[in-house]
Structure formats: C-alpha cells, structure tokens
Amino acid sequence: MKSNKTNWIIGAIAVLVLPLILQSFGNAWVRIADVALLYVMLALGLNIVVGYAGLLDLGYVAFYAMGAYLFGLMASPHLSDTFPAFAAMFPNGLHTSLLIVIPLAAVLAAALGALLGAPTLKLRGDYLAIVTLGFGEIIRIFLNNLDHPVNITNGPKGLGQIDSIRIFGLDLGKNLNIGDFQISSVTLYYYLFLLLVIGTVVVCYRLQDSRIGRAWMAIREDEIAAKAMGINTRNMKLLAFGMGASFGGVAGAM
C-alpha cells in the first residue's frame, strides 16, 4: 500500500515537472505533450463507448471536430465578418469565455452523439462500425464544404484569428513571468489540458463502478441477458454515445 502511494506521488511530480524540463529543449516538445494529453482525453471518451458499452464507434473523431469548430466560431470575428446582422450586435466577434465554451461543446457533442446513436440502436459489430465510420466521413465533408452558399466554416481554409484561451484573466497565449523564471504559453496549455484529463479520469473511474457503468458492461457482455434483467438497453446505449461524445467535444474545443 505504501509502495503504491509512493509511486503515485512520484508519478504526479513527474507529470507536473515534465513540461518545465521539455521547454528547455524547445516549445515543440511541450506542444507534443499538449497534443498527447488531448488524445488521452479523446481515448478516455472513446473508451466509454467502446470499452464500457462495447459499441464499436469509428466516427468518434467527428465530435472532436465539432468541438473545435464551435470554439473557432465563438472565439473569432468570423461570424461578424460573414453576417451583417450579427456584426451589428457583435462588431468585434463573440470572443466567448472558455467557461462558457466548454459546457456548450460538451452539450453539442452529446446531442450529436445521441443523434448518431438513435438510428444505430439495433446494429452490432461490423455493421455499427461501418455506419459510424460513414458518420465521421459525412461530418468531415460537410464541414469542408460549408463555405457556400453561406460561409460558416470557411471551408478547407479553416477559421482564423481565433482567440487564445483566457482563464480568470490569465491569457494562456502569452508567456507567464514569475520573477526571473518564464513559463511558456505551450506549458500553460499543458497544465490546462492536464487538469481536464484528470477530471476525465475521475469521471470515468466513478462511472466504472456505478449503476450506469455496470449496465453498460452488462450490455457489452450479453445484450439479450441485460434486457432480460430489466436494463433499458436503448437508453443506456444512447447515454453511452452521448457521454462519450461529450469528452470528444471538450477535447476539440481545446
């Protein structure tokens, strides 16, 4: 027990110190760690759908894209530049706070996840995988071509002039100076992503042994037996799709 506690403490210290060491070799190394943390969050969200509920979702990255575009639209002047009526209300763009974007990204992705799950409730295995793969490809094509007749996503060019993330007045897009020591912007992002990953791990850990988590695992092992035991498999599947997608949406917004 003492050995496990020591390992946890050493691991926590290593994770906290890692970006400070990496930034001495260049910000590119810290940026790799940033992206890795986002992929960890994506994997944890996907694990809810595939690992807990046993639903082979190959279009999961679509929720990542939706979260990214949501943040891009809400933290840039693109909508004001495209729609005159919108520009009259917000001449400089929305520039929405991260504290608002995160729950919105989670809700939007969860709604899309449930929307994807609804027509696939009776599909299993390879058939479910093919449908979800098609969904992911549809979203990619849709976003790439949503620049006409009304320019919403700016097509393959993407959205520009997106704000850096601000938290309680701290601009993560700028280096932070503490005395003679400077913490780079990418390192600040690292700690934000690390905090979100820890939150995701806690939620997933709590779900695993909860009533919902056990219901998902029962469906994964034998859906017919789970239904015979009184589990509402339809609602549980939709919940798995929605909850898993919400983590992908938040990761994309980052």
Give, region by region, the residue ranges found by the protein language model.
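Transmembrane alpha-helices and adjacent helix-loop boundaries
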Residues: 1-254
